[in-house]
Structure formats: C-alpha cells, structure tokens
Amino acid sequence: MLDFERPIKELEERIAELHRLAGESEGLQAEISRLEEALEAARRRIYTNLSPYQRVQVARHPERPNFRAYRDALCEDFYELSGDRHYGDDAAVRGGFARIRGRNVVLIGHDKGADVKSRVEGNFGMAHPEGYRKVKRLYGLAARFGLPVVTLVDTPGAFAGRGAEERGQAWAISEDLMALAAVPVPVVSVIIGEGGSGGALAMCLADYLGMLENSYLSVIAPEACASIIFRDSSRAPEAAEALKLTARDLKEHGVVDEVLPEPLGGAHRDPEAAIRAVGEALERVLAGVSGSSPEDLLKRRYARYRRIGSYQRLPGPSSG
C-alpha cells in the first residue's frame, strides 16, 4: 500500500468488516452504502490530484500489470527468441514473434517478473548489455521480415553494475538507438510503468509513443536526482516536479503522442481495463501505419525527433 492510499485502505477495511457483520445484523446496509460512496469519492479525490512523485510510486507498484500480463492477454500467439548471439540471454528483456489482434508483429518488453524468483531472475527489469543486444537482434529480424515492432517499456533503467559496464552497456544501448532510427518498419511503443533513462530509451525511439497516465519517463530517477542536485534524497518529490516526467508533461512537450487512461486507482486496481486500453491503442495505431512505405516512415521519424527539443521565445517583462 502506498502512503497516500491509506485513507482508501482504511475505508476498504471498514467496508469489508461491515460486510462480514451484515449477516448478523440487517441494519448495516445503509452504513455500507454510505462508506462505499465515501470510498469512491476518496479514490476520485486522491487519484485526480496525484503529484508527479506519487505517479512515480504508482508506476512502481508491485501489483501493476507487467509485460507478462500484457503478453498473455493481448497475444494470440507468441514465439519467444532468446540470446544475443554474443554472450548469453537476459531475462530482463523478452521478445519474439507475436500476433496481436490478428496482426503479426515483433513484440519486445522489459520483464520485471511476477514473483520473487522471476523478479530476481529478471533483475527487476534492469537489463544487461546482452539484453540490449538481443533487442537489436529482434529489430533486425523485424526489418528482415517486414514486421512492425511493438515495445512495452517498464524499467527503472539499464543495470549499472561493473560487469554490465565491462560488457559495453552504453555501447549496446547506443546500437539499439541507431537500429531504431533506421529500421524500415513501423515502431510502436507504450510505456506501461517505469521509463528509466537510457534503459527505456533503447526501446521507445518510436513512430508512436504512448504512455499510461501513471507511468513516467525520465533521464534519472527522482531519488537519484535529489541526491545529486540537492544532496538529499528525501527531496525526491521536488525533483520529480522539476523533471517533468509524467505522461501529461511529456505530451505537452511533444515527446509523447498519447496519454492512455488508467482505471481509477491505477492499473493495479483493474489490470484488465489497463491492458484493454493498451490493446485498443496498439490495434488503432498499427492499423494507421500499416500502409506506410519505408521511405515515408523514415522521413516522418526523422522529422518527429527533429521537432523534440524545439523552443519558443516568450516576450520579456515590460519596461513600463
């Protein structure tokens, strides 16, 4: 339970207790109805006024649907491919040939795992160089077979351990970016949770970038930013505000194409609704780009990223 969800949790527990007692007393239904209305109002009040850092906390929620949940719900078929053909495999990133709502694609995603064992195996979604080299290999296969690339991004960032650095972490990510910039097929990306730094960027340099409304995309985690800038990690909420890392901030700045709605209370409250929203977006976007020629795709992709980072001059303070 997140700290700001405590009032919601208390109401839920009170309602559950009254439901338990309702069999013994018939005079509790009115109180249950009143508390259920209060619960709905509390959810709406809290979740329509989340701060940027609270959205980061929601994006990290352990019960939030992960890559496996989306894969299992959206894919009619999925044939996983493993290994980078250089060093080994990396369970933090999974990908392969898939069929999503009748359309053949190459599906790639960060895998945070579903239980303790799989989370440790997948390093909590923090990929090593071999993971990013596997991703590049999958981009190449998509180009060879003319299949759209679909990526589901959910990572705190690329793993920064000594072994990863020795095996060329930064190089592997840069190779992914180069491959994505030039791959002659549609690239559709959705950030479903965390979008941490280069580890996320290696999979979201796309023709379409969507974000679930409580996901984030940032060059650095708020806690790390606060430690560096303020010398105080407890100022993470302040750092999150300054980083402009929320889906709505990034949509406003032209980085993100669409903010996908989550159920009230976050994706972890109703995973099926969140997965359905992502599935509908993927179906719509893939249908829209399916007829594009490689030349048009690359031209639009280039123009898209040239626009990001542009600025406008604002009038200065009046001299009067």
Curated annotation (Swiss-Prot):
Keywords: ATP-binding, Cytoplasm, Fatty acid biosynthesis, Fatty acid metabolism, Lipid biosynthesis, Lipid metabolism, Nucleotide-binding, Transferase. Component of the acetyl coenzyme A carboxylase (ACC) complex. First, biotin carboxylase catalyzes the carboxylation of biotin on its carrier protein (BCCP) and then the CO(2) group is transferred by the carboxyltransferase to acetyl-CoA to form malonyl-CoA. It catalyses: N(6)-carboxybiotinyl-L-lysyl-[protein] + acetyl-CoA = N(6)-biotinyl-L-lysyl-[protein] + malonyl-CoA. NCBIfam families: accA, AccA_sub, PRK05724.1. Pathway: Lipid metabolism; malonyl-CoA biosynthesis; malonyl-CoA from acetyl-CoA: step 1/1. One of its GO terms (cellular component) is acetyl-CoA carboxylase complex. The keyword Cytoplasm applies. It comes from Rubrobacter xylanophilus (strain DSM 9941 / JCM 11954 / NBRC 16129 / PRD-1). Gene3D superfamilies: 2-enoyl-CoA Hydratase, Chain A, domain 1. It is found in: Cytoplasm. GO terms for biological process: fatty acid biosynthetic process; malonyl-CoA biosynthetic process. Its EC number is 2.1.3.15. Belongs to the AccA family. InterPro entries: Acetyl_CoA_COase_a_su, ClpP/crotonase-like_dom_sf, COA_CT_C. This is Acetyl-coenzyme A carboxylase carboxyl transferase subunit alpha. Residues 34-288 form the CoA carboxyltransferase C-terminal domain. Pfam families: ACCA. It is an enzyme of class 2 (transferase).
